[in-house]
């Protein structure tokens, strides 16, 4: 990597209420979850990924929410084939989140284009019908509010090839 221009984090008991928050005096405790959103630049191109870390034992709701965003990422990956749209990718991810107990997706989109800028067109949303073609680089970033004030978000990077999607980021473990 040439540099790592950003690192943002958030934490809270059993989830977090924002993935981008400033520092606090709060001490991490058993049952807390820390999210780190970071990336690097290599030869002018960005990567962007989120990782979740559990401190001690988390409750079942938190574990299930993490499982839902992880599985939602897999669903988005499977849907991201040439000729599909970013709406198809969003829908595949949202269906898994909704089945997993999502109350909402407060961000609205579940990933974005990636390249010489950190956030590029297109966006994985319900109303962005961009057709995926080989060479398109996307983040898959499903996020869900699963209880009041508790979110879970996951993010990976993919590229669309003639044969389907390929992971660009090293896949996070299935368990926090």
Describe every region a protein language model picked out.
Residues 1-176:
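Active-site neighborhoods and metal-handling regions in enzymes and metal-associated proteins
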